[in-house]
UniProtKB/Swiss-Prot annotation:
Protein name: DNA-directed RNA polymerase subunit omega
Natural source organism: Rickettsia africae (strain ESF-5)
Primary role: Promotes RNA polymerase assembly. Latches the N- and C-terminal regions of the beta' subunit thereby facilitating its interaction with the beta and alpha subunits.
Reaction(s) this enzyme catalyzes, per UniProt: RNA(n) + a ribonucleoside 5'-triphosphate = RNA(n+1) + diphosphate
Top-rank taxon, per record: Bacteria
Enzyme Commission number: 2.7.7.6
Record-linked HAMAP family: RNApol_bact_RpoZ
Record NCBIfam families: rpoZ
Length: 127
């Protein structure tokens, strides 16, 4: 059987970097997704080879694969706003102990800072 090459896939996806990212994503989908009937036929090949073959043959929707990749990279964490004033004040109190440290480009501002070593003892940086 003929080997699949990047040149075959470049007809579909001209940018090699984009090809690598999309083929990797599709190979992962093949690996995790249950496509037993289709993979049994191509049983001897690994998911990256199957992905490249399908991309070269035009069996994969590149636009759908790109959208799937973008959706997988998005974060879905939602931050809930603080409604209660007491809650917001409690959160502010937790961060009051943090000292304000300003560091210049040459780090000379750290010369007079005092740090705590691993034994819990203070030491100055200019020693």
């Amino acid at each position: 059987m003929a080997r699949i090459t990047a040149e075959d896939c470049n007809k579909i996806i001209p940018d090699r970097f984009r090809l690598v990212v999309l083929a990797t994503r599709y190979a992962k989908l093949l690996n995790y997704k249950v496509e037993t009937n289709q993979i049994k036929k191509e049983k001897r090949d690994k998911p990256p080879v199957i992905a490249l073959r399908r991309i070269a043959a035009g069996k994969v929707s590149v636009a759908q694969l790109e959208q799937d990749l973008i959706n997988s990279l998005r974060t879905r964490t939602m931050i809930e706003p603080l409604v209660n004033q007491d809650e917001s004040e409690a959160v502010e109190e937790k961060f009051e102990y943090l000292p304000e440290v300003y560091i210049g480009e040459d780090y000379s501002d750290l010369d007079d800072q005092i740090f705590i070593d691993e034994n819990g003892e203070d030491y100055e940086t200019d020693k």
